């Protein structure tokens, strides 16, 4: 109890009375925040670093952990899967990855996205004949039905996803 009082007094003396603006407002929007409480007349907001994102991207995108995980979540999936073979050092991958995640999220669960780092999962990259990154595969019922290499704009990605969903 004493710790809460001390924390409340400290926060009262440190935190400004203005609501978050600018960069902080954008960081706290679209997040699940803990309840606000009143400390000496001030409304205390949680730190943006302690918020939980609840965007659809988190629900439709996953990182492949190993070969059996790929088999279970991609090959055996009843939902069509877009597989993004990428690398940490790849510049175009850093552009395509978020763009592709956004487009997959817009499909509302009709397709999911698996991300495979080729440096961590060389065996999968070899098995699926990935010779350059980014390489994106469309897998439906365990079979590769489409593929592209390189960066694409949003219109091309949308057409790629629509073709996969059918």
Swiss-Prot record:
Species assigned in the record: Mus musculus (Mouse)
Name of the molecule in the record: Thioredoxin, mitochondrial
CDD domains documented for this protein: TRX_family
The keyword Iron is annotated on this UniProt entry: no
Record site: Contributes to redox potential value: 91-92
Record-annotated membrane-spanning stretches: none
Keywords annotated in UniProt: Acetylation, Disulfide bond, Electron transport, Mitochondrion, Redox-active center, Transit peptide, Transport
Classification lineage: Eukaryota, Metazoa, Chordata, Craniata, Vertebrata
GO CC annotation terms, alphabetical: mitochondrion; nucleolus
One Pfam family it belongs to: Thioredoxin
Coiled-coil region: none
Cell compartments where the protein resides: Mitochondrion
Boundaries of the annotated transit peptide in chain numbering: 1-59
Cysteine-cysteine disulfides: 90-93
Gene: Txn2
Any GO MF annotation of the entry: protein-disulfide reductase activity
């Amino acid at each position: 109890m004493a710790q809460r009082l001390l924390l409340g007094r400290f926060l009262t003396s440190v935190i400004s009375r203005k609501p978050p603006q600018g960069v902080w407002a954008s960081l706290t929007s679209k997040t699940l925040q803990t309840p606000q409480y009143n400390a000496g007349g001030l409304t205390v907001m949680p730190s943006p670093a302690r918020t939980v994102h609840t965007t659809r991207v988190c629900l439709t995108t996953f990182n492949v952990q190993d070969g059996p995980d790929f088999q279970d979540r991609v090959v055996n999936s009843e939902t069509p899967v877009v597989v993004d073979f990428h690398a940490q050092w790849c510049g175009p991958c850093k552009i395509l990855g978020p763009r592709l995640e956004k487009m997959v999220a817009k499909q509302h669960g009709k397709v999911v996205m698996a991300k495979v780092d080729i440096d961590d999962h060389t065996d999968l990259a070899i098995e699926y004949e990935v010779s350059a990154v980014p390489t994106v595969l469309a897998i439906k019922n365990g079979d590769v039905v489409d593929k592209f290499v390189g960066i694409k704009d949003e219109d091309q990605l949308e057409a790629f996803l629509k073709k996969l969903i059918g």
